[in-house]
């Protein structure tokens, strides 16, 4: 019967939370399933429904997601949790419906993207990372599959949002004399995805804010050049390859500013607050030098007439350079103020 919940799925037509009707299954993983649902109380309004079945023993991953999204509710450019609850056989969360993931876009339109797209996505991810860090959490599993565009027609349709906080961990503790960073454990279990995690995670050290930035480093590199360990499965071997690779090789097809970007990340220690503002300015400098605009079409969008004066040949990018701006506002989506605030004070 519609509405019955099996061990692995919900039927099309099932109603969750007395108002969210399942209309399409979007995906499935070891931690549950994702569905597109329609709000029966608001015609035409759709959301994403995440369901975590108790039979799958996912370890309350959904509970962590609800907790983080609830704390991010007042932040901009983040998915919103609009409802959550528990049933006898599953837990659920209703959240903002997003567009395609970066992973999907790379597979469909890649394997590589142009620099204008690379740096804009990089800025969006950097902002998303900072939003999570500012409420006292680490993501710990940043990868292209966990970054997605806003849904078409929404205010965030031109932004890329960070999502999937199931492996997140709080890095602050409320002690007698105020909020403090938690002391790192000597050794930890592996958390994350081997292709994108930091070398420190390969060594099973406690992850800090800087480790999320290392994931961004590898995502940025992969948007322009195949990672040397792309086809390697062994975690130890991947860790050794990351240790040995030179920055100039990692970012061989990227603007020179990326070398300063990775150098800045490398100089950041566990207890250090990352210099988000400096990292933002490095990516923004790429845009300024090549006259890239936030209104430019993304790599997979129809190209407008090229403007010869704004081609990317300053970086040796070949024929695929800057695209002429479309009809979107020319103003930057972000400002320095988005990256220099420090609500935690450390």
From Swiss-Prot:
Which is one Gene Ontology cellular component term of this protein?
Answer: nucleus
Keyword Nucleotide-binding set for record: yes
Cross-referenced Gene3D superfamilies: Transferase(Phosphotransferase) domain 1
Give the superkingdom in one word.
Answer: Eukaryota
**GO biological process: one example:** signal transduction
In this chain the Protein kinase domain maps to 20-287
Reactions this protein catalyses: L-seryl-[protein] + ATP = O-phospho-L-seryl-[protein] + ADP + H(+); L-threonyl-[protein] + ATP = O-phospho-L-threonyl-[protein] + ADP + H(+)
Concerning its family, UniProt says:
Belongs to the protein kinase superfamily. Ser/Thr protein kinase family.
Q: What is this protein called?
A: Putative serine/threonine-protein kinase K06H7.1
Name the source organism.
Answer: Caenorhabditis elegans
Q: What taxonomic lineage is listed for the species of origin?
A: Eukaryota, Metazoa, Ecdysozoa, Nematoda, Chromadorea
């Amino acid at each position: 019967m519609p509405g019955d919940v099996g061990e692995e799925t919900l039927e099309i037509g099932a109603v969750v939370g007395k108002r969210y009707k399942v209309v399409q299954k979007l995906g499935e993983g070891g931690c549950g399933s994702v569905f597109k649902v329609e709000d029966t109380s608001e015609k035409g309004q759709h959301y994403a429904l995440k369901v975590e079945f108790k039979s799958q023993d996912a370890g309350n991953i959904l509970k962590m997601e609800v907790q983080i999204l609830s704390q991010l509710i007042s932040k901009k450019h983040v998915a919103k949790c609009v409802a959550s609850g528990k049933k006898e056989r599953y837990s659920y969360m209703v959240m903002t419906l997003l567009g395609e993931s970066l992973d999907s876009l790379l597979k469909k339109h890649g394997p590589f993207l142009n620099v204008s797209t690379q740096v804009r996505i990089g800025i969006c991810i950097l902002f998303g990372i900072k939003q999570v860090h500012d409420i006292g959490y680490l993501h710990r599993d940043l990868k292209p599959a966990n970054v997605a565009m806003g849904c078409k027609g929404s205010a965030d349709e031109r932004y890329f949002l960070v999502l999937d906080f199931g492996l997140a961990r709080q890095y602050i503790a409320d002690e007698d004399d105020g909020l403090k960073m938690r002391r790192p454990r000597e050794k930890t279990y592996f958390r994350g995805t081997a292709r994108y995690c930091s070398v420190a995670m390969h060594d099973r050290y406690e992850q800090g804010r800087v480790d999320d930035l290392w994931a961004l480093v590898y995502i940025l590199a992969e948007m322009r050049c195949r990672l040397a360990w792309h086809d390697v499965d062994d975690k130890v071997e991947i860790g050794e390859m990351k240790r040995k690779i030179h920055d100039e090789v990692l970012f061989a097809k990227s603007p020179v500013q990326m070398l300063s970007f990775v150098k800045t990340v490398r100089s950041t220690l566990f207890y250090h607050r990352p210099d988000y503002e400096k990292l933002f300015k490095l990516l923004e400098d790429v845009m300024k030098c090549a006259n890239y605009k936030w209104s430019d079409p993304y790599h997979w969008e129809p190209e407008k007439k090229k403007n010869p004066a704004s081609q990317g040949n300053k970086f040796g990018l070949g024929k695929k350079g800057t695209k002429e701006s479309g009809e979107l506002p020319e103003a930057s989506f972000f400002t320095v103020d988005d990256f220099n605030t420090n609500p935690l004070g450390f």
